[in-house]
């Protein structure tokens, strides 16, 4: 039984596995490899020269992609009083406090991002074991613990994505959909790369961006030349 289907093999045949592609060339190619019968997500994986065993070399943050993500995002906000009203006015999908905590404890998780005002974190902390492993716990580093709930909601709805290093020092994040034109994907790719360059830990030694791979949901990986990518982002 073949490991991959015919569509994947046809897409993989377009990619030179030994080549480091120019960023724009890689984006044009990844669109050609997206052959599934749905609008595939385009994702980038950066292998960074960081030692995540040290807390000061763990990278976590968020960036607003100028071209958006192409995804409808459901935002939940933990807030009370005036801040709850602000959240509702800004377009939050769910707003509440103890009621939402109880609902989540019962197994409800129909949202993509959670935001909380700082005064709500003692309450939200009860959900650590549920939200933490799913990457849904509000965090000041990603701008999801804030009193400026309206701005947080607007940024998330506009295309804010979170990123963090995993145990292997890899950051993987989406930069849009296969239906996006190359220029829109390029703007998002650049924004994400710039954010990671700004987040470089002072203690990181040697080459920072060791490898960069771009792929569609069901497609093969395409290696991007890190030096060309860094030079493009720093212009």
UniProtKB/Swiss-Prot annotation:
One of its GO terms (molecular function) is rRNA binding. The keyword Repressor applies. Keywords: Repressor, Ribonucleoprotein, Ribosomal protein, RNA-binding, rRNA-binding, Translation regulation, tRNA-binding. Pfam families: Ribosomal_L1. This is Large ribosomal subunit protein uL1. It comes from Symbiobacterium thermophilum (strain DSM 24528 / JCM 14929 / IAM 14863 / T). Binds directly to 23S rRNA. The L1 stalk is quite mobile in the ribosome, and is involved in E site tRNA release. Protein L1 is also a translational repressor protein, it controls the translation of the L11 operon by binding to its mRNA. Disulfide bonds: none annotated. The keyword Chloroplast does not apply. GO terms for cellular component: large ribosomal subunit. One of its GO terms (biological process) is translation. NCBIfam families: rplA_bact. Belongs to the universal ribosomal protein uL1 family. Part of the 50S ribosomal subunit.
């Amino acid at each position: 039984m073949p490991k991959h289907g015919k569509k994947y093999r046809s897409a993989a045949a377009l990619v030179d596995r030994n080549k480091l592609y120019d960023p724009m060339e890689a984006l044009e190619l990844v669109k050609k490899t997206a052959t599934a019968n749905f609008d595939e997500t385009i994702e980038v994986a950066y292998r960074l020269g960081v030692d995540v065993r040290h807390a000061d070399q763990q990278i976590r943050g968020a960036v607003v992609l100028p071209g958006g993500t192409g995804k409808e995002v459901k935002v939940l906000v933990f807030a009370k009083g005036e801040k709850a009203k602000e959240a509702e006015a800004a377009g939050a999908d769910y707003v509440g406090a103890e009621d939402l905590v109880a609902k989540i404890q019962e197994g409800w998780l129909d949202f993509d991002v959670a935001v909380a005002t700082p005064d709500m974190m003692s309450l939200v902390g009860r959900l650590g074991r549920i939200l933490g492993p799913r990457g849904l716990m509000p965090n000041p580093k990603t701008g999801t613990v804030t009193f400026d709930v309206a701005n947080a909601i607007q940024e998330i709805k506009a295309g804010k994505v979170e990123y963090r290093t995993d145990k292997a020092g890899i950051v993987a994040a989406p930069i849009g959909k296969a239906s996006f034109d190359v220029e829109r994907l390029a703007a998002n790719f650049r924004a994400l790369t710039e954010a990671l360059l700004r987040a470089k830990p002072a203690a990181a030694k040697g080459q920072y961006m060791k490898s960069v791979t771009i792929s569609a949901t069901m497609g093969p990986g395409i290696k991007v030349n890190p030096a060309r990518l860094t030079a493009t982002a720093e212009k």
